[in-house]
């Protein structure tokens, strides 16, 4: 009797398992095409920017050679700051404002306490419009266009030992040539959001200056300025930003 009961129990168990497997085989799962969308770009922040710009200094170096100074060499390092925000009305679009500048000086001492030198300073202030493409999470590529105004200041000085009373004399010379420009700047930046609040940037740009106007000592206009003296040149930039970065 016990054997018969165990046999029936085993038979029922095997039948139940087999029936369950048949039911599972008869179940058909419908395939659904799930479209995975890339997240839109959103960034709001500000921070430090640095740029190595390769500008033409050939005509400036001719002047350096004529007065006994060493040549200037590119690149020039510029530093400053930028702030930007995404525009919600147009997805992935961003506007920004930045300002940065830098300078180099070539100086040499001569006999009789005479010091000659040239200081070359360049700066940019302007706006930028960028469009963000999110490649993968936290990584975006942003091509864009910058525009604004730029300046080049060239200070040429020749001084000897100087004291306060020498202001009344002509024992020194110092002239400042100041050039002002408009510029446009195509650029491409690669930006990585380390966290939702910290972002790193690496990019390239090429400012193009036009509409130049030159003055000496902010008084007299200067003519026959070499065309190479412009804020034009390929540049590599980097940045460190804090804010809100959601992409």
Task: Label the predicted regions.
Residues 159-171, 216-222:
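Solvent-exposed loop segments that connect transmembrane elements
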Residues 21-88, 241-247:
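Short glycine/proline- and aromatic-enriched beta-strand/turn motifs that initiate or cap beta-hairpins
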Residues 72-77, 81-85, 178-190, 194, ...:
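Outer-membrane beta-barrel transmembrane strands
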Residues 189-247:
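Predominantly the C-terminal beta-signal and adjacent terminal strand-loop region
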Residues 65-70, 107-118, 169-176, 221-229:
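Extracellular loop and loop/strand-boundary signature of outer-membrane beta-barrel proteins
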Residues 90-167, 181-182, 192-194, 233, ...:
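Gram-negative (and chloroplast) outer-membrane scaffold detector with strong preference
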Residues 1-29, 244:
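Bacterial Sec-dependent N-terminal signal peptides
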Residues 44-50, 83, 95-97, 129, ...:
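Membrane-embedded beta-strand positions of outer-membrane beta-barrel proteins
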């Amino acid at each position: 009797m016990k054997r018969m009961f165990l046999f029936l129990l085993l038979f029922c168990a095997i039948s139940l398992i087999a029936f369950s497997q048949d039911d599972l085989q008869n179940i058909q799962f419908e395939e659904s095409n799930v479209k995975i969308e890339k997240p839109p770009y959103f960034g709001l922040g500000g921070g430090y920017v640095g740029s190595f710009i390769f500008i033409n200094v050939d005509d400036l170096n001719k002047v350096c050679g004529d007065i006994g100074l060493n040549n200037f060499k590119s690149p020039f390092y510029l530093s400053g700051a930028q702030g930007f925000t995404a525009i919600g009305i147009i997805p992935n679009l961003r506007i920004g404002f930045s300002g940065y500048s830098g300078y180099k000086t070539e100086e040499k001492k001569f006999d009789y306490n005479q010091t000659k030198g040239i200081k070359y300073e360049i700066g940019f202030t302007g706006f930028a419009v960028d469009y963000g493409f999110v490649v993968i999470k936290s990584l975006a590529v942003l091509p864009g266009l910058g525009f604004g105004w730029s300046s080049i200041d060239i200070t040429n000085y020749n001084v000897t030992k100087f004291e306060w009373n020498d202001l009344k004399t002509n024992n020194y010379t110092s002239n400042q040539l100041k050039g002002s420009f408009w510029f446009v700047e195509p650029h491409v930046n690669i930006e990585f959001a380390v966290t939702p609040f910290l972002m790193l940037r690496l990019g390239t740009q090429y400012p193009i200056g036009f509409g130049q106007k030159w003055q000496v000592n902010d008084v007299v206009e200067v003519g026959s300025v070499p065309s190479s003296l412009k804020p034009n040149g390929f540049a590599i930039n980097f940045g460190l930003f804090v804010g809100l970065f959601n992409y």
